[in-house]
């Protein structure tokens, strides 16, 4: 998957409203296998397989399918010690039959022993602060005393320290992944079911890691409601700035659903923060096959100018001035050129807005008179051809410029 040069990185606050280029928040580089998150690197795309990790063959095939279509980091669920040990076989088989793929293990309830085992077989371990040291809620509880709060905090440190030291020794990373729906009971009593509670959950684990000299951390604060996800991540950035922290953020909307709305919901959350310069890696969570998440990720990044991995199409919405069937022609142009990378192609229905709106495009396809198409290279009109030859001649123009590759 080709990626063009990344946008400028700045330690300043998000760009002013007049800026046309997104200025990303400066973050520390965090390794996940051969991929680096943060540190000015392009925003990383990741997803998670659906297969049971005990199914070695199925898991390897699923990881490979995702990686082959551009998923740069793949997460797997590890709910038991047997699953943790299975990761050794999965990793070995990937190396033997395909290639190394950056792998993340997802560890949840009281997961110290599981995490310690799987840390030997993956590149990153994701833990959920609300579940890593799980205290069963008491139905009759009305408050947490400071002593009770601190007692659990000490237990968290005791349980987290061995994992931190293992990852530190192996030069591997950790994701502190907070979910709005699984905040620890003591956080709920102290901060409420709020973005503040999510941020404080993350900070508690970050402070423990820092006290042990461990900084290979990425942070995520996810929620199924977009406004909560936005507020939590913005507050996390504010608090990290106040504390002098520069950890990269993993963005996502949990339980976004499926279909058009699931994609819109994910884009509303992820895209909004990326536009503010916040975010170093993303996952679009859909109730569909994981492979369907990857194109959405790359489309969000391309729309924001953060990564260019496909053709950028500029096309007008059509109106009474349009001189050809715009929808049909756009479909033909897209089908003929969608395998290319790094080009901007404009398909405009008339001369009124065509040349101006497509001024930044590499190539233009414009209806200037009935039955004929004008082809442009940048702002220059190159030739006028019969409409039925338009797509073919556009391809010939791209080929003549040496920018065509066969699909």
Swiss-Prot record:
GO molecular function: 4 iron, 4 sulfur cluster binding; 4-hydroxy-3-methylbut-2-en-1-yl diphosphate synthase activity (ferredoxin); iron ion binding
Cofactor or coenzyme needed: [4Fe-4S] cluster
InterPro entries found in the cross-reference section: Dihydropteroate_synth-like_sf, IspG_bac, IspG_bac-typ, NO2/SO3_Rdtase_4Fe4S_sf
Cofactor note: Binds 1 [4Fe-4S] cluster.
Reactions accelerated catalytically: (2E)-4-hydroxy-3-methylbut-2-enyl diphosphate + 2 oxidized [2Fe-2S]-[ferredoxin] + H2O = 2-C-methyl-D-erythritol 2,4-cyclic diphosphate + 2 reduced [2Fe-2S]-[ferredoxin] + H(+)
Keyword terms, alphabetized: 4Fe-4S, Iron, Iron-sulfur, Isoprene biosynthesis, Metal-binding, Oxidoreductase
Residues that bind [4Fe-4S] cluster: 316, 319, 350, 357
Top EC category: oxidoreductase
Domain of life: Bacteria
Pathways involved: Isoprenoid biosynthesis; isopentenyl diphosphate biosynthesis via DXP pathway; isopentenyl diphosphate from 1-deoxy-D-xylulose 5-phosphate: step 5/6
Enzyme Commission number(s) of this protein: 1.17.7.1
Protein purpose: Converts 2C-methyl-D-erythritol 2,4-cyclodiphosphate (ME-2,4cPP) into 1-hydroxy-2-methyl-2-(E)-butenyl 4-diphosphate.
UniProt record similarity statement: Belongs to the IspG family.
Protein's name according to its UniProt entry: 4-hydroxy-3-methylbut-2-en-1-yl diphosphate synthase (ferredoxin)
Species assigned in the record: Cyanothece sp. (strain PCC 7425 / ATCC 29141)
Lineage: Bacteria, Bacillati, Cyanobacteriota, Cyanophyceae, Gomontiellales
